[in-house]
Curated annotation (Swiss-Prot):
This is Truncated non-functional calcium-binding mitochondrial carrier SAL1-1. It comes from Saccharomyces cerevisiae (strain ATCC 204508 / S288c). GO terms for biological process: ADP transport; ATP transport; mitochondrial transport. The chain crosses the membrane at residues 231-248, 307-326, 355-368, 409-428, 458-475. Calcium-dependent mitochondrial solute carrier. Gene3D superfamilies: EF-hand, Mitochondrial carrier domain. It holds the Pfam family Mito_carr. Residues 11-46, 80-115, 120-155, 156-191 form the EF-hand domain. Ca(2+) 2 binds at D93, D95, D97, K99, E104. Keywords: Calcium, Membrane, Metal-binding, Mitochondrion, Mitochondrion inner membrane, Repeat, Transmembrane, Transmembrane helix, Transport. Ca(2+) 1 binds at K65, D70. One of its GO terms (molecular function) is ATP transmembrane transporter activity.
Amino acid sequence: MLLKNCETDKQRDIRYACLFKELDVKGNGQVTLDNLISAFEKNDHPLKGNDEAIKMLFTAMDVNKDSVVDLSDFKKYASNAESQIWNGFQRIDLDHDGKIGINEINRYLSDLDNQSICNNELNHELSNEKVNKFSRFFEWAFPKRKANIALRGQASHKKNTDNDRSKKTTDSDLYVTYDQWRDFLLLVPRKQGSRLHTAYSYFYLFNEDVDLSSEGDVTLINDFIRGFGFFIAGGISGVISRTCTAPFDRLKVFLIARTDLSSILLNSKTDLLAKNPNADINKISSPLAKAVKSLYRQGGIKAFYVGNGLNVIKVFPESSIKFGSFEVTKKIMTKLEGCRDTKDLSKFSTYIAGGLAGMAAQFSVYPIDTLKFRVQCAPLDTKLKGNNLLFQTAKDMFREGGGQIILQRCHSRYSGHISLCCIRFGDFFCLKKMVYCQTGKDPEPTTRSGHSKQPGCTSNGCIQWNCRSFCCLSNQSFKNKTTSPRNICTSLCV
């Protein structure tokens, strides 16, 4: 069993001084927050680039709250932190051999999540995924551990067959010593009573994979959606969600196309009356109210679902192309960056992969989107309804410009879509980090079945303005030859 007090006070002071020297990048005996951030970058600490975590750590180190950490502050912090780290080490090191193996870390993290890894045969596949994730965390937290890796039972290996030897050379043979454990967790902030859990939460929060949901929404998931069952489930949910929101999409297209409607938020009724002296001031209302009345007079409730069938049709091909192209793009970016695995991709490369995947998916379904918009922009007094209107609109489009008209103005759509993917992902990530720093908990915990975690309504709402102008440009270009910024704002402000 490892003894806690195996080093003298003098040795401990020397070690503290050496650690503090690594953080004191300017060598003036004082460490500021900026110095600590620079030290993490210089020493290639696993939490480098995570300003929120470093700020929390600096606050804990600044014992006297003077915004500066000196050697005295650091010693007080380290002494208290090491006592907590030792107690945690003892709880994980069940065999008390002074070493922690990866399996012991797996069990501890699983207990924190109230999830079993080894004793659930029904979730064997999921368990393997969790073990692999914990293994990646082990490598992330202890990148320099290779020099200290030991293979247990090496003496007995000489007497065993090659098959037995290969069985023993597994992840379970990897371990870290208490010194390595202490040196890593000493520079990790403590939340919810566990530095290890905090470290794992940061690893999970900033090193997980990224995918795209329907309409190019960036989705963070535990592992890439696998299996035909998940694909079908995602498609069905997309069909339901699009059907539920079809009336809002119908109103959106109506307002974009009707450039003659003026917003009562941007203009006073007096100004609107001056432009149209014959109008009744009592009947001047919001464009949204006019849109609802006009559509209802056209065909009742059914009028709000015009074009929804095309929306439903494109769900499955769009999703399959999106996920497939995203994986292919990630592999290409992995080769360009020289990474061994897509998990090691930088966030910038993930942005690019997400944007390109969104563009590929949009390109594949753009003809359907174009046809849907034309159908929704049909004259209100038209006698054609349903499939007759759909087929007639398709024939008219083909006669007007053949295949070229299908891809007309698609560059505006692409510009808005790639910005939507990148901005939504960045905004969601920032908001998620803010929530985590305030609560110390993952704002969207992992589900056991591996279901995806989508950006919340706040992050979605914050960035819709950024890409909506591109959609207006694209859609109005089909309806009219010219588009003015005022018309775009009018369509947005109802």
